[in-house]
């Protein structure tokens, strides 16, 4: 079993309303159930971070899921996600890794309905991530991250 802790710095900027930022702490567990299947669970924003002048609470989310790897370069992902403020969200996705340095991602979710596409590029110990999220009511979101592994 693997245990991990991550710090995330989030910045929100809305035109004509200003910007705000916050530090969030996440905790995760992962266990290999077999050569093909792994299980994971995570709590995001375990520190209850808030944002803005109104101190709006940021999402606190519990997730549990399975990853199935039918081939070395392909993962199928199934996840139950529960934000403490909203209904249970079922998510499904896949990760295709055609090269050791490149991962391509796609996924769908049902609460609310949305889909996402993304990629990761690994250069030595650095990881560069980009994701595009299409929400039927809120429109398009672009996300980027840089990580050290």
Where are these regions (language model features)?
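Outer-membrane beta-barrel porins/channels
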Residues: 1-149
């Amino acid at each position: 079993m693997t245990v991990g802790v991550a710090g995330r710095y989030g910045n929100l900027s809305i035109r004509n309303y200003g910007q705000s930022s916050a530090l969030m702490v996440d905790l995760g567990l992962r266990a290999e159930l077999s050569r093909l299947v792994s299980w994971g669970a995570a709590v995001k924003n375990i520190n209850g971070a808030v944002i803005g002048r109104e101190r709006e609470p940021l999402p606190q989310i519990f997730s549990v899921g399975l990853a199935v790897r039918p081939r070395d370069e392909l993962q199928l992902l199934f996840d139950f996600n529960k934000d403490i403020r909203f209904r249970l969200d079922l998510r499904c996705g896949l990760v295709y890794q055609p090269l050791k340095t490149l991962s391509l991602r796609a996924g769908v979710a049902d609460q609310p309905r949305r889909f996402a596409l993304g990629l990761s590029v690994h250069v030595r110990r650095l990881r560069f991530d980009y994701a595009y999220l299409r929400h039927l009511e809120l429109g398009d979101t672009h996300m980027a991250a840089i990580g050290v592994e």
